[in-house]
Amino acid sequence: MKPAARRRARECAVQALYSWQLSKNDIADVELQFLSEQDVKDVDIAYFRELLSGVAVNAASLDALMAPFLSRQLEELGQVERAVLRIALFELSKRDDVPYKVAINEAIELAKTFGAEDSHKFVNGVLDKVAPTVRKRK
């Protein structure tokens, strides 16, 4: 699968996770609704599904990984930033095939696309601190 298809999977995952975090609906329902309403022809659907289910199942442990490195309480974290950080930490902790730098760079790009004005700086700062505790730099 092309790298662009993975990037699109991450972009879609941010949007679907944002919806899930706000709605508290079942992740399978969020996935079905998202796939029925969005244009996903250039998306690595299998990877999108893995990110979505993987983050949902591991949300508490992913939050616990990032919490010590946040400059504010986890509850005060913006929903976009939380979704982006959860995806990056899922990739770093569960997907050894995703290079360390790729996971971080993709998260920064996602934050630039979907986050507030300086959220990419915040995401970069958090991941710069937490990532080495999750996986060795390669």
From Swiss-Prot:
Disulfide bonds: none annotated. GO terms for biological process: DNA-templated transcription termination; transcription antitermination. One of its GO terms (cellular component) is cytosol. Keywords: RNA-binding, Transcription, Transcription antitermination, Transcription regulation. SUPFAM superfamilies: NusB-like. InterPro entries: NusB-like_sf, NusB_fam, NusB_RsmB_TIM44. One of its GO terms (molecular function) is RNA binding. It comes from the Bacteria. Belongs to the NusB family. Involved in transcription antitermination. Required for transcription of ribosomal RNA (rRNA) genes. Binds specifically to the boxA antiterminator sequence of the ribosomal RNA (rrn) operons. PANTHER family: ANTITERMINATION NUSB DOMAIN-CONTAINING PROTEIN, N UTILIZATION SUBSTANCE PROTEIN B-RELATED. This is Transcription antitermination protein NusB. It comes from Yersinia pestis.
